[in-house]
Amino acid sequence: MDVVNQLVAGGQFRVIKEPLGFVKVLQWVFAIFAFATCGSYNGELRLSVECANKTESDLSIEVEFEYPFRLHQVYFDAPNCRGGTTKVFLLGDYSSSAEFFVTVAVFAFLYSMGALATYIFLQNKYRENNKGPMMDFLATAVFAFMWLVSSSAWAKGLSDVKMATDPENIIKEMDVCRQTGNTCKELRDPVTSGLNTSVVFGFLNLVLWVGNLWFVFKETGWAAPFLRAPPGAPEKQPAPGDAYGDAGYGQGPGGYGPQDSYGPQGGYQPDYGQPAGGGGGGYGPQGDYGQQGYGPQGAPTSFSNQM
């Protein structure tokens, strides 16, 4: 019990909610329905033979047949209207297609159960070295092909079984029914709805296994080289160098450098550092407005270059 509890506790049951595990559950269930509806079939037909001599007639002849539909081994006793009976055998052997269909269904059932247990309890081993998904994909592809072949073969085989067990066709092959004065009638056809259902489940399994190929294929990683990453955001182009000068703001000629506003080449440059007795002009005590400030020698010093 401890081992079971550990397995249950360590199981990743959420995989059943994912497409990979959920489809595997459907495959397991539909495989059961496929081989159960075909392998457990048991049919019966009825007919009557009425002889000219009423005492020799048999008005209720029952003929039973079942899986695997070796009809050539099925017979019934019919009156020959001459005081005796004759063994009448059905025609055909359709066991190959029926047994092939059931065999594929049984193996699909077993594989689905094993794969589902691996998904839940051995997820790490399944993904180790990517071997598990690769083997799973190959097995799924094989089973998809086998479902196609077996379902198609069984659909044809079922059509032949219906023809061989049709009371009208059986009556046509009976010698006693061709004799004058004798009357043969069909009383009941065999019910083959279960066999029809088995064919439907066969093709449903085909759809499930083919569809599951995509989910298993994604687990293999083979699709990674074909998946392109979404394009990234385009890089922002730098502004042209001559938009605001080659050197930028405050970095030399051509920009918006503050050094030229009051630079050495011109501008308002009052000399506040001259001594009081200096003769350089300005507002010193030795000069007035007629000598140095606005003399005929030229314009004021502060505007000599800019004006």
Swiss-Prot record:
Region (Repeats, Gly-rich): 248-298
Location(s) in or outside the cell: Cytoplasmic vesicle, Secretory vesicle, Synaptic vesicle membrane; Synapse, Synaptosome
GO biological-process terms attached to the record: regulation of neuronal synaptic plasticity
This protein's UniProt keywords: Calcium, Cytoplasmic vesicle, Glycoprotein, Membrane, Phosphoprotein, Repeat, Synapse, Synaptosome, Transmembrane, Transmembrane helix, Ubl conjugation
Residue ranges with Gly residues bias: 247-257, 275-296
Function in brief: Possibly involved in structural functions as organizing other membrane components or in targeting the vesicles to the plasma membrane. Involved in the regulation of short-term and long-term synaptic plasticity.
Name by which UniProt lists this protein: Synaptophysin
The species this protein was found in: Spermophilus citellus (European ground squirrel)
